[in-house]
From Swiss-Prot:
NCBIfam families per the UniProt record, alphabetical: S16
Alphabetical list of PANTHER family matching this protein: 30S RIBOSOMAL PROTEIN S16, SMALL RIBOSOMAL SUBUNIT PROTEIN BS16M
Pfam families associated with the record: Ribosomal_S16 (PF00886)
GO cellular component assignments: cytoplasm; small ribosomal subunit
Listed HAMAP family: Ribosomal_bS16
Gene Ontology molecular function terms on file: structural constituent of ribosome
Protein name: Small ribosomal subunit protein bS16
Keywords: Ribonucleoprotein, Ribosomal protein
Natural source organism: Staphylococcus epidermidis (strain ATCC 35984 / DSM 28319 / BCRC 17069 / CCUG 31568 / BM 3577 / RP62A)
Family note: Belongs to the bacterial ribosomal protein bS16 family.
Keyword Transmembrane: no
InterPro entries in the cross-refs: Ribosomal_bS16 (IPR000307), Ribosomal_bS16_dom_sf (IPR023803)
GO BP: any one term: translation
Length: 91
């Protein structure tokens, strides 16, 4: 089963709010998920607000889940991909 780390949309019209989730690549955007990793609020007052469970994200990355482009950018901004690369190269 191909697994992706991606965003599911919540919120109202013109006021998006996203959950960062792990889901089967074949399921629809807002369909069934495997696990929720965190939230992303791009409309926050000063800067986009990101809350993510770092340990869960690293676990899924080690298990082979592929992040989408947007989630890849979010994870790199939060420093999670750097930690993943360090752990991967340390082995």
């Amino acid at each position: 089963m191909a697994v992706k780390i991606r965003l599911t949309r919540l919120g109202s019209k013109r006021n998006p709010f996203y959950r960062i989730v792990v889901a089967d690549a074949r399921s629809p955007r807002d369909g069934r998920i495997i696990e929720q990793l965190g939230t992303y609020n791009p409309a926050h007052v000063n800067a986009p607000e990101v809350k993510i469970d770092e340990e869960l994200a690293l676990k899924w990355l080690h298990d082979g889940a592929k992040p989408t482009d947007t989630v890849h950018n979010i994870l790199s901004r939060e420093g999670i991909l750097k930690k993943f690369d360090e752990q991967k190269n340390a082995k």
